Design a protein with these regions (language model features):
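Beta-sheet entry/capping signal
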Residues: 3, 15-16, 82, 95-98, ...
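Short, glycine/acidic-rich hinge or "gate" loops at secondary-structure transitions
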Residues: 70-72, 90-100, 143-147, 302
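Acidic/histidine-rich catalytic neighborhood
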Residues: 80-137
Length: 377
């Protein structure tokens, strides 16, 4: 985050020079100093990718509860990004805001077909996230104006097909296996769709089931970690563990580095190269953490996506961080005894789903709970 913050002058320069807008936007393929390096233009020069960087700032606030960081870092970064995107959006015949051009990384590779009918679900999900989160930021800082809500209200809803779920764009569905699940950004990593909502549930199920149906032929290493997260979004621990096992067995070198292709020729995908990249290892680790702990809207759930194979095995973790800086430590023994300790780093209230109760703590306070499977019944 400090690195991204240090590149704000370059982001402002690129927004002005390339897009002709105010605000800030980094090139999506850049050198260490923030200079544009180029690449397939529909992805390397896509302005909505900047919103993914914004999410990193907000996630830091969400998991720390640091209001000073929200005020001095998150709000300025989001606002500068929104200034760029707002100028690029144009009102269509139906009154909805659309980008001049739209894509969905890396659908159709670098062919002309990769320019999708605006707005792609990738772009649209990120735009909704940007303006909706700005509304939340203003509310949390006590200075709501209604401005960002008015912009978000002029964005169309996500494009959905009843059988295949989230579409690529308003007039195109995903018809073949592909390494990027960019059309599913609203599920992961943006977490805009909630499985507990019946309407969202049907969209999530259709989207994930369709990806599974198309198969992993054109997936690469990071696809398996991403699919694990999509399975976790619907509490499918078995499905998540299956994808993580495939990732670890077929895409990691002996030293743990991710090599992106099925370099052992095991048959799990059609790519057999071995380019080293870092992000997929982090993605898989993130998926494991989300199997252990879910934290949304101050509702905390331990083992939200527990695989069947873990049911009778000991499980333990210490000081995983939930929303508003709540530190969670948990242990389950093989004979079904559970212990949970929560410690606050900020004042707050949280609902503990596993114990079905609210806990209110001041910074530095902790609370412990114990139960057995019989108690729970």
């Amino acid at each position: 985050l400090d690195y991204l913050w240090s590149l704000r002058p370059q982001a402002a320069k690129f927004a002005r020079a390339f897009y002709g807008t105010a605000g800030e936007c980094l090139p999506s393929v850049m050198d260490i100093d923030g200079g544009a390096l180029g690449g397939w233009p529909m992805y390397s020069l896509s302005p909505t990718n900047q919103i993914w960087l914004c999410q990193m700032f907000y996630e830091y606030y969400r998991l720390t509860g640091d209001k000073e960081f929200l005020r001095t870092r998150v709000e300025p970064y989001f606002t500068a990004t929104a200034a760029c995107l707002e100028e690029l959006l144009q009102e269509g015949p139906d009154g909805k805001l659309v980008l001049p051009v739209s894509s969905s990384p890396e659908i159709h590779d670098d062919e002309a077909a990769s320019w999708l009918t605006p707005n792609s679900n990738y772009d649209l999900a990120l735009l909704h996230y940007l303006f909706h989160t700005l509304v939340q930021i203003e509310y949390q800082l006590g200075n709501s104006r209604g401005y960002w809500h008015a912009i978000e209200s002029k964005l169309a809803p996500l494009s959905v097909d009843t059988e295949t779920g989230l579409m690529l764009s308003p007039d195109e569905t995903l018809k073949e296996t592909h390494r990027h699940f960019s059309h599913a950004m609203a599920i992961e990593p943006l977490c805009m769709l909630r499985y507990e909502n019946p309407q969202d549930r049907s969209v999530i199920d259709a989207t994930v089931d369709h990806l599974v149906h198309l198969g992993s032929g054109q997936w690469v290493g990071f696809s398996f970690g991403w699919m694990a997260l999509l399975q976790i979004a619907r509490s499918n621990g078995n499905g998540a563990l299956y994808e993580l096992h495939r990732f670890a067995e077929h895409f990691l070198s002996r030293n743990g580095f991710h090599l992106n292709g099925d370099y052992k020729n095991s048959g799990v995908c059609d790519f057999h190269y071995r380019p080293f990249t870092l992000e997929a290892d982090f993605l898989a680790a993130h998926a494991v953490q989300k199997m252990l702990l879910r934290s949304e809207k101050n509702h905390i759930e331990v083992l939200p996506a527990c695989p069947q194979g873990w049911k009778n095995e000991p499980v333990a973790f210490q000081n995983l961080r939930a929303e508003n800086g709540l530190l969670i430590s948990y242990q389950r023994t093989a004979d079904g005894k559970h212990s949970l300790t929560v410690k606050a780093t900020q004042d707050g209230s949280w609902y503990l789903c596993n114990t079905h109760c609210w806990v209110t703590l001041q910074a530095g306070q902790a609370q412990s709970y114990q139960w057995t499977e019989e108690n729970k019944k």
